[in-house]
């Protein structure tokens, strides 16, 4: 992988990881259109590190508060809105772990194709448009009960299917349940922390045991670029989503999905 390819792939990952637009749909384009090689396991780990660092740094105050409240609830039995939210985030993480553990090989074998990605990109664009239009937009993330957390967690599990978008699926589910746009985004971003930690740890373990040679210069680019772009993306999205809503992302997904189908039909 050249340094330019590393830069572009990390930029794509950072910009799309937290937007409801599907990072897998974007990452397949360089390989399909430009013939770029697969980025490899080590680079996957690098961009996970970069995006994880970005979301933790951006929400550093919330993360410290939530973890402190969670630990206090365990050892002192003192339950607060913050400790409850932390438990709900943990609950919402479970379905994706189970689904990923048992369905990963099937998905990699049968569903990781450009046609599937194009189709799911379009389907979830329509779902996002519908729920954003009809949502009551009245709840914040601290009003998340176990039923809501589990429902959003199931949406996150479904996002293992390529093209769905983890953030897109979780925001869609949260909006359907009546969350405000900002609360849906914030809960989705906070939910990403444990799932990125688990996915990154799994990939890191595979990397250590694989003996694959590591290009540290490409990895450094991957970490730095994905971190900067993801941090900027989170900041911009939270500033804009309450004003512009989800429609720009719906339109973008539709254009991307149909554009990918047109490209595949032309081959």
Curated annotation (Swiss-Prot):
Keywords (A to Z) from UniProt: Antibiotic resistance, Cell inner membrane, Cell membrane, Cell shape, Cell wall biogenesis/degradation, Hydrolase, Membrane, Peptidoglycan synthesis, Transmembrane, Transmembrane helix
Keyword Disulfide bond: no
Bilayer topology: Multi-pass membrane protein
Broad EC category: hydrolase
The keyword Phosphoprotein is annotated on this UniProt entry: no
Catalytic activity annotation: di-trans,octa-cis-undecaprenyl diphosphate + H2O = di-trans,octa-cis-undecaprenyl phosphate + phosphate + H(+)
GO molecular function, one term: undecaprenyl-diphosphatase activity
Protein name: Undecaprenyl-diphosphatase
Source organism: Photobacterium profundum (strain SS9)
Lineage: Bacteria, Pseudomonadati, Pseudomonadota, Gammaproteobacteria, Vibrionales
Gene, per the UniProt record: uppP
